[in-house]
């Protein structure tokens, strides 16, 4: 539930911006999540290994599809269609992005290892953009 709320808050924040580029939208959401986890180390420790659960749990996806069209999964799938992004397996790509964020940011946020999170972000965002390129 905590990671689900984190992504929901990120989407609500995105809706208040004028970001229209698909990759920039995904980076915005990831940046929002990282910044929130940086502000709340206890939350980071609590959900560090299960960040993708809030987006990818099949039960949640089914409920959200009925209740809320605007979740990260739907934004991602809609974005790749609208932008003609050719991904071999969009589900796997989204899962990889979220897992990459969850697994690599933990040490950067808590221990500044291998870099502080602010120094690490450009590397992370470059990899995410590469995953989203045609």
Predicted regions and their residues:
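Short linear capping/connector segments at secondary-structure termini
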Residues: 12-16, 47-56
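Generic C-terminal helix-cap and adjacent flexible tail
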Residues: 132-134
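Amphipathic alpha-helical linker/stalk segments
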Residues: 1-28
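Regular secondary-structure segments
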Residues: 8-15, 34, 102-109
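Amphipathic alpha-helical packing segments from all-alpha helical-bundle domains
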Residues: 5-9, 24, 35-36, 42, ...
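Helix-loop "lid/cap" segments that line or gate small-molecule binding pockets
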Residues: 31-38, 49-52
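Short, residue-level hotspots on alpha-helical faces of the histone-fold
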Residues: 2, 32, 70, 74, ...
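Hydrophobic/aromatic-rich alpha-helical bundle segments in the mid-to-C-terminal region
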Residues: 45, 49, 80-127
């Amino acid at each position: 539930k905590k990671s689900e709320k984190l992504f929901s808050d990120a989407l609500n924040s995105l809706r208040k911006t004028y970001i229209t580029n698909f990759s920039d939208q995904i980076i915005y959401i990831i940046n929002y999540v990282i910044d929130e986890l940086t502000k709340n180390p206890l939350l980071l420790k609590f959900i560090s290994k299960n960040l993708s659960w809030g987006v990818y749990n099949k039960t949640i996806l089914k409920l959200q599809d009925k209740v809320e069209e605007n979740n990260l999964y739907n934004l991602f799938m809609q974005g790749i269609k609208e932008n003609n992004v050719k991904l071999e397996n969009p589900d796997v790509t989204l899962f990889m992005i979220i897992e990459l964020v969850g697994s690599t940011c933990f040490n950067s946020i808590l221990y500044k290892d291998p870099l502080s999170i602010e120094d690490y972000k450009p590397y992370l965002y470059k990899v995410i953009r590469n995953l989203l390129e045609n």
